[in-house]
Amino acid sequence: MSAHPGSADHSSPSAAPHVPARASRLFVLVAGEASGDLLGAGLIEALRRRYPQARFCGVGGPRMLAAGLEAWYPAERLSVMGLVEVLPRLVELLRLRGDVRRRSLALHPDAFIGIDAPDFNLGLERKLKAAGIRTVHYVSPSVWAWREGRAARLGRSADLVLCLFPMEPAIYARYGVAAHFVGHPLADAFPLVTERAPARAALGLAADAPVLALLPGSRLGEIARLGSDFLATAAQAMASMPNLQLVIPAANAECRSALQALLDAAALPAARWRLLDGDAHTALLACDVVLLASGTAALEAMLAKRPLVVAYRIAPWTYRLVRWLRLMRTDRYSLPNILAGRALVPELMQEACTVPALTRAVLDLLGDASARSVQVQEFERLHRLLHGGGSEAAAAAIAERIESPAGPA
């Protein structure tokens, strides 16, 4: 692969590379999971509208590939979570990161854009920044929740941090880090008022039947820890509500296989559940209540205006380390509760995440229209807060950075 045209003064981290003609823009992007793949695809499309001849290389998933990414590796190679879980794959991840660094140095792109995956991307960004490559980190780590010291580390790694949530730039300002709120692209993917009937028709669901969506995670480890309990919860809810239907979107083929195996073992009535290939968006719009693993799915359910119950269970040793090291800065885990600043949706974490507790929370929401209404009304307010331009705003901030010789703060 030939080097990207242009030369740079590599004598210091602040050295600005030569800015080539727009037609020859080159961007390297690295995303490590399904949510990053979604953000990366939107960003590629927005950047291409500015630079029609641009080239995009790096690590991404199916959405980024469809948007035009030349993939060096699939995003799943980076998808690992937890302090303990990463250890068996550490050598592989370090080797992969070294290869991405070498490729990026050879190409010398207009910008390297790390999308989330901070434990993989920040060290990589720091080395590329030192080589005179402009670096952008898209999606702030959850510094408002744990390991706030990462905010200072980002300033050493990234020339620019693109924040999805409005409370984040103020944290970075305390560390002198350039950070911009660009809004969350998912806020533009859902209307403020959503309709249920078209989604149900698309999935072949009865218009008047109660529907529960199950989203146990987009990682195999999450499905292993939560999938069986989610299905057991669904079985108990179905016993209480004989007309209850289930929709279960699988993030990818591996997740589908894992979920299918759990469904086979659970022996739920086949006529009452649907396992979907992706299509979480439609599943959320079709349902009445969502039971999901904490993460981006909670934000998507919030934006779909669907009442939800959040659950999560990490590996026991990771949980003990987090508690022992006092890494957590918040007693709220899900984005709806963090954004609302209160316990808006039920959260059942670690020891509290049991089948009886999950079942009670799900049935309480399914059976209480006023409780659902309280969540939905607040979801509408929070949706408005997250509008900021999304992918277009992110592309504009990147364009401003690469087109300025010094790079604006």
Tell me what each language-model feature is.
Residues 1-409:
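Nucleotide-activated sugar donor-binding and catalytic core shared by glycosyltransferases
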